Amino acid sequence: MIRAVNPSPSLSGPVVLHAPKVRRSPLVFASPHSGRDYSADLLAWTHLDLIALRRSEDAFVDRLVADAPRHGAPLVEARFPRVFLDPNRAPDDLDAAMFDQPRPGATGSISARAAAGLGVIPRLAADGRPLYQTRLPLAEAQRRLDVFYAPYHTIVRREMEAARACFGDSVLIDCHSMPSSSARGADIVLGDRYGASCSRAVIARAEAAFRRQGFAVVRNRPYAGAYTTEHYGRPEAGMQALQ
């Protein structure tokens, strides 16, 4: 089996903050699923080739929003591959059957996403094939949470709190892509957890901006937002989130 060359070797760590020279906006942009740093230590765990692995990416979304710092808003970029660690999941959203030993304190329950192979440590690639031929060491799951997940969310939280301190409110723009077939007739899907994660004014302003550019926009269907939108979207606390 032929492996492609690592398309984006990272020289600056698994999570990168692109900070503006001067913060001029309450917005914080995040690109959680466009990471393409397929390091040798991660590739060693799977038998799938790089082409199959990369199908799980929201490819190059980070480049679409790369100008955010120039407009006064930070961009948090995950460079680790989503197929090995998904930051848009709760940290305990694990399928216990994937690992060589039980997690301490685990309740035995499993979310629908983890059961489908798409927990914080995914079991399946985008084409439905298993990523692993044997159970993973639980220590490897913890390593990924420590090295990838924790730094990502630490930076997102810090930037949102900094924006709130400056402007009285902060708005996380959680940036993703989608298959063309998943929302027929729509170019843009805005997710606000059905009104729970941001104010009506914020989503209305985003929708109007896209429509002025000629895009067809729908709300929440089929993507209302997952862990990130739900976790950070606290309008009553001055922190909002829009996917």
Regions found by a protein language model. Give the residues of each.
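N-terminal catalytic or cofactor-binding beta/alpha core of small enzyme domains
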Residues: 2-172, 177-243
